Amino acid sequence: MEKKKYNISVEATLEVIGGKWKCVILCHLTHGKKRTSELKRLMPNITQKMLTQQLRELEADGVINRIVYNQVPPKVEYELSEYGRSLEGILDMLCAWGANHINRVYGDTFSVLEESVLNDKLKQES
């Protein structure tokens, strides 16, 4: 593997978790294992193709584990790997920053956020 060159280390971070969907996927996986269909339901605006691509990239980077159960019909779940769990603090801070940003721009965080487990957690903390 050829070594890459980065100007600053955050470039390496964004190479792994950057983009529109990866942090959202990771946030959902902080709440436990999820099947692809569960993730799709939690993120209705992502296409199936994009979800599959993002999951493959996160798995290739060692951030998530793909668990294949030997059964019929086939069952596959995704979970944060031990390495991926090291991102939980960062993901929590990103969620908190986003809530503050929404509140600053719109005045009320919860009038803008959709109903979800992640947002219920945020409501309990405020």
Curated annotation (Swiss-Prot):
InterPro entries: HTH_HxlR (IPR002577), WH-like_DNA-bd_sf (IPR036388), WH_DNA-bd_sf (IPR036390). Disulfide bonds: none annotated. SUPFAM superfamilies: Winged helix' DNA-binding domain. Residues 8-106 form the HTH hxlR-type domain. Gene3D superfamilies: Winged helix-like DNA-binding domain superfamily/Winged helix DNA-binding domain. The keyword Isomerase does not apply. Pfam families: HxlR (PF01638). The keyword DNA-binding applies. This is Uncharacterized HTH-type transcriptional regulator YtcD. It comes from Bacillus subtilis (strain 168).
